[in-house]
């Protein structure tokens, strides 16, 4: 795998890896697939970016605390660690940090947001067919009845210290819940937009910060894209008005690295449910679309297992060409 990603191993991560290695055979197996990256330079001969890591629970941690420390969202941490109590995890417990990703299947520069994954990918000026620079961030998206719109749009305006003008629909919702809002929420700690906001060409929708960072990585917004304060600050500084934004619905992603085919599966949106058979058919369609001109061999049981787990972690399912399947 080529050098690529936004995460460098932290001291805590390295300590946790050593502790976990000493404690369990599982940790040894996980270390076999860890890929360390530095900077954000990438070569698209690999469709995978980032690094898979182990951490451990310190006394008083919640899973949300660990997620925030490692630039993760809540849901992706829950999917990767389903057996761990998110609010009262036992101190010393191993925690998988699922920060290894298959790139979305897109051909565009700019910002790409994958709704089921609740993750943003920011590509440089060229497409994934060439060398590019890329960053990735967890995001919150619209809940079921307030879904985030899909499709192509652009950044139309950037606002620092924005005031929030809640639309009538949100004013009515809060009033019905006994939590009335003012017609204008001024900039400051009570403003849910945070310190930075970028307006989208889809009227009424924004990419913005938050005053409730522990909600990042959940379907909790009224359709806007919400980011950790430190991430929106960086994105705001490096994004121009007119930047392209593409919002997609890709619960299943496939990619290749060093001749090995990987599958990354996330739960489908509740408004677009799919059973195992339909998800399997979609996986085969994606494989034919990406590798149709090449020979490839699959471990079909591995495909089915990944689709059942839906844990968001790239899983080896086969090989390209005449490589030996393992």
Name the predicted role of every residue range.
Residues 78-86:
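Short acidic beta-strand-loop surface patches of small beta-rich interaction domains
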Residues 21-37:
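Bacterial N-terminal signal peptides
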Residues 1-22:
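N-terminal secretory signal peptides that target proteins for export/translocation
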Residues 42-71:
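Primarily a LysM-type cell-wall glycan-binding module
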Residues 60, 92-95, 242-245:
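Loop/turn positions that initiate beta-strands
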Residues 64-68, 75, 79, 222, ...:
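Solvent-exposed, polar/charged alpha-helical surfaces in well-ordered, non-transmembrane soluble domains
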Residues 170-326:
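Exported/periplasmic cell-wall-interacting domains
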Residues 73-75, 90-162, 270, 285-326:
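Cell wall/extracellular polymer interaction/catalysis modules
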């Amino acid at each position: 795998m080529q050098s690529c990603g936004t995460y460098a191993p932290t001291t805590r991560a390295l300590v946790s890896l050593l502790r976990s290695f000493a404690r369990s055979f599982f940790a040894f197996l996980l270390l076999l697939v860890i890929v360390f990256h530095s900077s954000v330079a990438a070569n698209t001969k690999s469709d995978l970016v980032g690094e898979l890591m182990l951490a451990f629970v310190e006394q008083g941690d919640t899973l949300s605390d660990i997620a925030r420390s490692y630039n993760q969202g809540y849901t992706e941490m829950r999917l990767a660690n389903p057996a761990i109590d998110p609010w009262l995890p036992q101190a010393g417990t191993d925690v998988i940090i699922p920060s290894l990703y298959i790139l979305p299947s897109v051909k565009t520069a700019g910002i790409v947001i994958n709704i089921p994954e609740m993750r943003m990918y920011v590509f440089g000026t060229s497409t994934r067919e060439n060398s590019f620079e890329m960053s990735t961030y967890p995001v919150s998206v619209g809940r079921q009845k307030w879904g985030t719109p899909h499709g192509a749009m652009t950044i139309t305006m950037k606002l620092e210290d924005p005031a929030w003008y809640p639309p009538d629909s949100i004013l009515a919702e809060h009033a019905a819940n006994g939590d009335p809002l003012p017609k204008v929420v001024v900039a400051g700690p009570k403003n849910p937009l945070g310190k930075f906001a970028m307006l989208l060409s889809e009227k009424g929708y924004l990419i913005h910060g938050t005053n409730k960072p522990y909600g990042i990585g959940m379907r909790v917004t009224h359709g806007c894209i919400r980011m950790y304060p430190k991430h929106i600050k960086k994105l705001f500084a490096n994004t121009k008005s007119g930047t392209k934004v593409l919002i997609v619905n890709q619960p299943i992603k496939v990619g290749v690295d060093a001749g090995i085919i990987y599958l990354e599966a996330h739960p489908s949106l509740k408004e677009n449910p799919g059973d195992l058979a339909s998800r399997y058919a979609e996986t085969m369609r994606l494989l034919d679309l990406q590798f149709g001109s090449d020979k490839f061999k699959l471990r079909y049981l591995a495909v089915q297992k990944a689709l059942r787990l839906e844990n968001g972690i790239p899983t080896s399912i086969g090989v390209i060409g005449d490589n030996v399947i393992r």
